[in-house]
């Protein structure tokens, strides 16, 4: 990789210092190892090229250096980085049983360490400082970096970004209301912390930076609309100054009933003078009507500024909660990706955590690269992406959208790469009982029935609650119908995202020509993994 030089400091600019500050240094490029792919209902072989979308398991410093060495410089239209915050917390992942049995069985079964956010003096800033030049080099000239942080380090990180990206490329600071203060927190000393900051920088503001203004839709009851808007026979409306509208355009708006005259006056059209005015004086207004949703509900669109209080945090959207710490909501990433990128653009998330960025990028038709050093994060992201990709595959074939009615734009799958040996799971699944049936037809199909899986903590709970079966302790099942013993190339995955949803245990996958080795992998709720293989000769 070529050397990366920082831009010269601006005259009179502020440069941040900290204990142990040193110029960024980078490791030599490493070649990651392909460990897994997922392409719904596609038969793949050793000769098949892996999908372009990719998830890296390992230190993102290695991943960023590798991407530059592999020719990705200047490719990413948008980078969303959600690094640790220097919170002083050892973050854990909470695992819950998937069951509709009594509520006491739906509590936390196990808490597992995921990542440490505890730093020695100066180490946190050096950690971020070392990665910023690499992120800058990966950005397209018209691209933008969105760096997510909170009150602890936002002031320091802005200084670092000014130094690495140039103060002239600062675009804005988004204040996102990530939570609403409740309980004892409302009495916090000198007010509770209820917001995060997102620092937005351009690679080259003069390019200019890709930008799509955003609008937000607000629903109002009839009483709320009546208190905020005027009303006529066509409904509720607001007015706006017509500005430099021509005489002909004003006549057209008047014919449509969209001009408003104040003080109870009328709109006068003077053909001789070629002017349109209000009979009782004052300025004319152009009417903009609220959309009626029926049942006394109305919708209004408004522009979005840099205070985002309309996107709830995870605490008020529990349906998205995957149990992974510091998870961000999909609505937040939807707005960011829609504002700074287009369909088909490359998006990078070097701290992907629970996988919100790649999941949203997949739905919005962006191409993506993501990375995380936590194996638990990689497992959570893989499971999430498996569910999204299968839904996108269905949407592409029958034009149905996802659960919220949005059309999934990209049925493409993804590949997983590792820079280090995959960490062995803390607790593995035991014996897996399968029933395999080959069904011949126009396309050969294999029916796979998972009859039982020996999961240690599920077995102990079943002694107390006999109705509890192995499915309650399973997060996902994936099947590779042509396993080569090296890379797990899944063609089908059962990865329910809803907390209480369970895997079905019965699947149909397209079959390659016999003989073939079919592999079934089960991941339990504690991150334990087990794979069993069956040789099918005919």
Stretches found by the model and what they are:
Residues 1-37, 41-48, 52, 69-73, ...:
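Accessory, often C-terminal, charged low-complexity segments
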Residues 59, 371-373:
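Conserved acidic E/D residue at the C-terminus of a beta-strand in Rossmann-like folds
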Residues 74-93, 161, 347-361, 370-371, ...:
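Conserved proline-anchored active-site loop of SAM-dependent methyltransferases
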Residues 54-55, 314-346, 352:
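Glycine-rich adenosyl-nucleotide cofactor-binding module
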Residues 56-74:
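Conserved RecA-like ASCE ATPase "motif II neighborhood" in helicase/translocase motors
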Residues 134, 139-145, 343-344, 364:
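Short glycine-dipeptide loop
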Residues 84-127, 142:
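Mobile active-site "lid"/loop adjacent to the S-adenosyl-L-methionine
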């Amino acid at each position: 990789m070529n050397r990366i030089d920082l831009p010269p400091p601006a005259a009179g600019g502020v440069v941040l210092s900290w204990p142990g500050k040193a110029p960024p240094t980078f490791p030599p490029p490493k070649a990651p190892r392909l460990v897994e792919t997922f392409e719904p209902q596609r038969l793949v072989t050793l000769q098949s090229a892996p999908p372009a979308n990719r998830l890296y398991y390992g230190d993102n410093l290695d991943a960023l250096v590798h991407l530059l060495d592999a020719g990705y410089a200047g490719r990413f239209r948008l980078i969303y980085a959600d690094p640790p915050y220097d919170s002083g917390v050892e973050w854990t992942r909470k695992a819950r049983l998937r069951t509709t049995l009594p509520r006491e069985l739906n509590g936390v079964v196990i808490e597992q360490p995921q990542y440490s956010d505890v730093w020695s003096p100066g180490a946190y800033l050096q950690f971020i400082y070392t990665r910023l030049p690499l992120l800058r080099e990966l950005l397209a000239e018209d691209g933008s970096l969105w760096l997510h942080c909170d009150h602890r380090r936002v002031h320091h990180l802005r200084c670092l970004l000014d130094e690495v990206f140039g103060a002239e490329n600062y675009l804005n600071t988004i204040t996102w209301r990530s939570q609403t203060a409740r309980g004892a927190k409302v009495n916090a000393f000198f007010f509770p912390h209820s917001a995060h900051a997102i620092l937005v920088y351009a690679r080259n503001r003069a390019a200019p930076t890709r930008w799509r203004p955003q609008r937000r839709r607000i629903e109002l009851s009839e009483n709320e609309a009546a208190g905020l808007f005027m009303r006529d026979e066509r409904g509720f409306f607001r007015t706006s100054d017509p500005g430099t509208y021509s005489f002909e355009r004003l006549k057209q708006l008047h014919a449509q009933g969209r001009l408003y005259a104040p003080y109870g006056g009328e709109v006068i059209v003077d053909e001789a003078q070629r002017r349109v005015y209000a009979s009782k004086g004052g300025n004319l207004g152009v009417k903009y009507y609220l959309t009626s949703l029926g049942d006394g509900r109305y919708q209004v669109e408004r522009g979005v500024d840099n205070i985002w209080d309309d996107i709830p945090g995870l605490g008020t959207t529990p349906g998205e909660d995957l149990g992974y710490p510091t998870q961000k909501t999909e609505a937040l990433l939807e707005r960011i990706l829609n504002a700074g990128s287009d369909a088909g653009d490359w998006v990078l998330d070097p701290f992907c955590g629970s996988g919100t960025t790649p999941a949203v990028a997949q739905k919005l038709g962006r191409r993506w690269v993501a990375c995380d050093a936590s194996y638990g994060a990689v497992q959570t992201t893989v499971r999430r992406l498996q569910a999204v990709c299968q839904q996108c595959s269905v949407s592409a074939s029958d034009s149905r959208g996802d659960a919220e009615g949005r059309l999934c734009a990209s049925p493409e799958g993804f590949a997983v790469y590792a820079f280090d040996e995959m960490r062995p799971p803390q607790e593995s699944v035991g014996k897996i009982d399968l029933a395999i049936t080959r069904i011949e037809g126009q396309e050969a199909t294999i029916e796979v029935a998972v009859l039982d899986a020996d999961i240690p903590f599920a077995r102990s709970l079943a002694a107390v609650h006999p109705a509890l079966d192995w499915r309650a302790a399973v997060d996902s099942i994936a099947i590779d119908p042509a396993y080569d013993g090296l890379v797990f190339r899944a063609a089908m995955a059962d990865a329910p995202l809803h907390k209480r949803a369970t895997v079905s245990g019965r699947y149909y996958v397209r079959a390659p020509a016999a003989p073939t080795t079919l592999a079934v992998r089960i991941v339990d709720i504690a991150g334990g993994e087990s794979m069993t293989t069956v040789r099918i000769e005919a």
